[in-house]
Amino acid sequence: LEIGGVVRLVRRVIGGTFLFEMSGAFILTLRFLKDMDVLHAIYYGIFHSISAFCNAGFDLMGRYSPFSSITRFYNDPVVILTISALILIGGIGFFVWNDLREHGLHCRHYALQTKMVLSATAVCLFGGTLLFYLFEHNRLFAGMSFGEQLLNSFFCTVTPRTAGFNAVDNGALSESSKFLSI
């Protein structure tokens, strides 16, 4: 790589990171405005977006209830899907984003790494969501609607790759679900 190529690569990484994190922050801030004043909503939106994208899992919701993470949003698709998307996009990495940007939906042109990452991610998401649903729909998710059960099954599948987000009480998961998480 020449120095110009390295500079271009770094710019793309920083630009892509900023785009994804700020998009997530904007969406989360708009949602948090329903429950918080403007400054807290902006701060929480930015903080949680960066935390999710970097797969850190840190959250500030303990202010509302100790050890709560984002459990108060267990039935909110905007929060759950935005944080899930940020975790997944941050987790698949820059080279996969770049391949997707360069080749669009033309899968034949993807690098082997991109094909493997996307395939493994899809299998894990589908399989994990199905298994969490089967393990928890009559237990932890029993009081939820079918849509909420699927949403939380999906979120339970996405979040083990982070250090701490949860929308349901992980301590109340069945042994099978806990095993699936590891």
Language-model-derived ranges and their functions:
Residues 1-182:
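Membrane-proximal intracellular helices of multi-pass ion channels
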